[in-house]
Structure formats: C-alpha cells, structure tokens
A protein has these predicted regions:
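Surface-facing alpha-helical segments and adjacent helix-coil boundary elements at the starts of domains
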Residues: 2-276
Length: 276
C-alpha cells in the first residue's frame, strides 16, 4: 500500500531497487534538491548527509554535532527513529539559539524528508497545547507527498493519545474539509492500533469514542479516506468485534452506497476471516 501511494503521486518514476538509483539522483536527494519518488528512494536517502548539506546551505553547521550525537545514541537507527531525533533536536537548537526562522525554512523545503523533520518540531514542542499542535500540523496533513502525510500523524499521535477526547473533538471538524488528505488524517491519526506506532488503549476498549470522526466519513468519496476508515474499524474489531459488527449493520441500512460497502468489507475482514 505504501509503495503504491508513493508510486502514483510523484511524477518522476523512481527506481525499483536501491542499487538501481542513478548516482546523480541520489546526490540530488541527499542534497535536498528533489523529492523522493517512491519508498525505495525514501529509504535510500542518507538523512545524516542530507542534514549536513541542509545546515551548510543555510549557514547553521553548528547544529550538526549535537544532532549527530543524538542519532548515535539511538538504540536502533531506522528511517523513522532518525527522522524523529533530527526533528526533535532541530527544535532544541532553534529554541536555544532563538532561530525560529529555520522552522519556516524546513517546513517549506523542497525535500520531503526535511519537511518530515519539520513535523516533529511541532509534535515534540512542549509549549503547544493539543489545539495549537493540530492547527500547525494541518498543513502537513495536506502535503502533496505521501511520506510527509504519513510522518505528520506519527509526530502528533502521542499528544492525541494523551488528550484523546479533545483531539477527537477537534479532528471531527476536519472530516468536512474539502481536501481528502486532511479528512484522511482525522481517521488515520486516531486508529486504535495503527501502523508503526503505539496503540491507543482507550480506543481499543471504547471504539465508540471515535464515532464523532467515523460517522461523517462512512460514505466518503475518496478511496484514500475509505481505506483509512475501514482499517480503523478493522483495528477495533480485534478487541471489540461486537461494536464493529453492529456499526457495520447500522451503516449498511443507513447508507446503501458503494463507498460504504467498500468500507464495511475492509472493516469486517478480520471478523469474516475468523467466521470461516
């Protein structure tokens, strides 16, 4: 699914394996001149080199050493953990140096990975309350690059989980936004189990809390949104199958559309599998 999303939305065709990435393309990726075209390229970018190039280009090379030290201290270095550490330490450096202009630079950068770092400068900012944090992350939820959209909900999910009721209330208003990416964020960021992230235990036990987001999206025209809503309910079905079964029956009666039928099929896949 991730690869498909990357492949369909970036015009330049990406390589099918790391070894096939042309040298000049890799150099442009590592210097922040172009966006990644698919997941293969996204994983191939040397984030430490990209960071060094960014800091040289913007005359902020003094930030490099403390950020690299934090990366070296990671127990496990993955694309996501390095992403998070760089974003968090950039926030620390700009705060210490009163250099908030740098946040504007990285938020609008050509490189999708640099924009990913920017999402963590929001998600890791202790001075922001949940309302302010979600307001700031909304622009990233509408980013044209799938990678940024995926990382932005990861960056704020811990705060969403800690302020669940307030977050659900705020995100429920995103379900009527014109941009399908913003609508999808409301669902994806609150999935009970989610991907690459900690579960939200309260939603695993009480998925009905999510109805404020799910109900408005039950017949959304966007497949991107439909997939997320279906996955949300499939998550919930692993701990509260009765709730999901009952809701799907209700939606089937209330909303006999092909969009709702698609969501229901996706939502019921674990339950249906266990019935066989």
């Amino acid at each position: 699914r991730i690869i498909e999303n990357f492949m369909t939305e970036i015009k330049r065709k990406g390589s099918r394996s790391t070894k096939d990435i042309p040298k000049d393309i890799l150099e442009q990726l590592n210097s922040g001149q172009i966006e990644t075209a698919n997941l293969i390229e996204w994983l191939a970018v040397d984030q430490k080199l990209l960071l060094e190039n960014l800091l040289k280009q913007t005359d902020r090379i003094k930030y490099l050493s403390p950020i690299l030290s934090n990366i070296e201290n990671l127990k496990k270095q993955t694309v996501n953990t390095i992403n998070e550490v760089i974003g968090t330490e950039i926030l620390n450096q700009v705060t210490k140096n009163n250099d908030f202009d740098f946040l504007e630079i990285i938020s609008k950068h050509k490189s999708d990975l640099i924009r990913c770092w920017a999402t963590y400068t929001i998600g890791k900012n202790p001075k922001l309350n949940v309302k302010e944090m979600l307001e700031k992350i909304q622009a990233f939820s509408a980013d044209k690059h799938f990678g940024v959209r995926e990382i932005c909900w990861l960056a704020v999910r811990p705060t969403i989980a800690k302020n669940l009721i307030k977050s659900l209330e705020i995100l429920s208003k995103w379900t009527n936004k014109e941009d399908e990416n913003i609508r999808r964020f409301a669902s994806e960021a609150t999935r009970p189990r989610g991907v690459w992230c900690e579960h939200i235990e309260e939603l695993k036990l009480k998925p009905e809390l999510g109805l404020i987001i799910l109900n408005p999206l039950k017949s959304d025209k966007s497949k991107y949104v439909q997939d997320s809503v279906g996955n949300w309910l499939n998550d919930a079905s692993k701990t509260q199958p009765e709730f999901v079964n009952s809701l799907c029956e209700k939606w089937k009666a209330e909303s006999p559309t092909k969009e709702t039928a698609y969501i229901i099929k996706k939502a019921m896949r674990t339950i249906d599998k266990e019935r066989k």
